[in-house]
Amino acid sequence: MFIISLTYIKPLEEVDALLEEHVAYLKEQYFLGIFLASGRKVPRDGGIILARAVSREEIETIISLDPFYRHGVAEYAISEFTPTMTSDDLAFLRE
């Protein structure tokens, strides 16, 4: 499991110009079963994505497809973790 933290490095005007493309990218990753949750940080200086994938390399490849990444408007930090405790609703995530 991975936590992907995006931090915007360009003005919000540049981020917003790519938002529709970024949302389409997110929807595709949800459809493929890779992304589990995502949303904006508060304050709005980036976002968080929860994802599952086979490897860090796979996540890095998936991130490289994000319009925010391709256009250089955000930096990405990837943290891998093993969920050992969850609420009952998220039991399917436990390893």
Residue ranges, per PLM feature:
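Conserved, structured core segments of small domains
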Residues: 1-95
